């Protein structure tokens, strides 16, 4: 007998066929499964996500979902809900370089408080924080007119700004109270700010992803289960599998299906038989700002 990679999940479409319980199919993870964040927006539909609104700066200002992104021109667009401190906001965005383009957290961006990546009044990007006093750090013009992954850690005593995974500045500006995620462009027609996706912590401390049922086409002897995952410190991914005769197991302990069996580690042996197989991934984190990312699962069975 020879082990072969037979069935599994490795793409967004694959994972979309499963069932989420406090987990999330994330663009941040290139289509992988993460713990559910407190707020997420993919901007992949035809309209704004539920709970988002537009506030034009002037007549003709717009914010619309176009080609898989939020595109803002002469307006502000943000959540209707406000959130307290102790959060991280991460987003993929592109600034055209026109003055007064901002993405970050604030109440309305007309008055403090705010924490934002901003073009300010020159063709350069800044990290800007403001509560009782403003503070800004010039990041230069190289970050304009191209997509980058931005992160703002809104801590109790400081604000940490990160671009493409590297911390660019820490500002000692304590900000208390409530703010909301906002994307803003200050003038109609002089350039747009584009946000592809947005995510805000805290992540759920635990969650479960249950895969669709895989069909081997006949009774087989299952050999092993392997997975690929990013597991930051304080997080974990665990897998369990079950096999059965029917294509649609019911809840609980369905007839004709084995109990869930934990897989000791990626690539470990699965001593079970049956035509159908299903896996369940348990994701956990004891750090609210971190999540593991499940990127691929492969189930192997014996063939003659």
For each feature predicted by the language model, list its residue ranges.
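Beta-strand-rich ligand- or partner-binding modules
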Residues: 1-61, 68-72, 78-83, 169, ...
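Short, aromatic/His-centered strand-loop micro-motif at the edge of beta-sheets
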Residues: 128-149
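Short tryptophan-centered beta-strand motifs in secreted/extracellular beta-sheet-rich domains
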Residues: 43, 89-93, 145-161
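Secretory/extracellular carbohydrate-interaction modules
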Residues: 69-128
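Short, exposed beta-strand/loop patches in secreted or surface proteins that constitute
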Residues: 23-26, 60-66, 113-120, 152, ...
């Amino acid at each position: 007998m020879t082990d072969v990679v037979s069935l599994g999940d490795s793409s967004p479409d694959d994972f979309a066929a499963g069932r989420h319980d406090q987990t999330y199919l994330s663009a941040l993870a290139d289509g992988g499964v993460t713990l559910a964040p407190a707020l997420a927006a993919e901007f992949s539909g035809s309209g704004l996500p539920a709970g988002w609104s537009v506030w034009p700066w002037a007549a003709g200002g717009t914010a619309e979902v176009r080609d898989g992104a939020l595109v803002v021109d002469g307006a502000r667009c943000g959540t209707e809900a406000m959130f307290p401190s102790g959060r991280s906001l991460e987003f993929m965005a592109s600034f055209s370089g026109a003055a007064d383009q901002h993405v970050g957290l604030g109440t309305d961006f007309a008055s403090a408080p705010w924490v934002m990546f901003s073009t300010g009044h020159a063709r350069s990007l800044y990290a800007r924080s403001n509560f009782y006093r403003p503070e800004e750090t010039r990041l230069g013009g190289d970050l304009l007119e191209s997509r980058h992954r931005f992160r703002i850690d809104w801590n109790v005593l400081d604000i940490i700004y990160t671009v493409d995974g590297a911390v660019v500045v820490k500002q000692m500006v304590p900000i208390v109270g409530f703010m909301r995620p906002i994307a803003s462009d200050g003038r109609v027609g002089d350039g747009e700010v584009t946000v592809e996706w947005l995510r805000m912590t805290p992540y759920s401390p635990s969650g479960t992803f249950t895969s669709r049922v895989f069909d081997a086409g006949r009774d087989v002897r299952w050999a092993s289960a392997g997975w690929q995952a990013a597991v930051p410190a304080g997080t974990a991914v665990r897998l369990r599998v079950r096999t059965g005769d029917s294509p649609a197991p019911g809840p609980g302990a369905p007839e004709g299906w084995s109990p869930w069996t934990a897989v000791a580690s990626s690539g470990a042996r699965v001593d079970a038989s049956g035509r159908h197989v299903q896996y369940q991934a348990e994701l956990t984190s004891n750090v609210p700002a971190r999540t593991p990312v499940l990127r691929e699962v492969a189930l192997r069975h014996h063939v003659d």
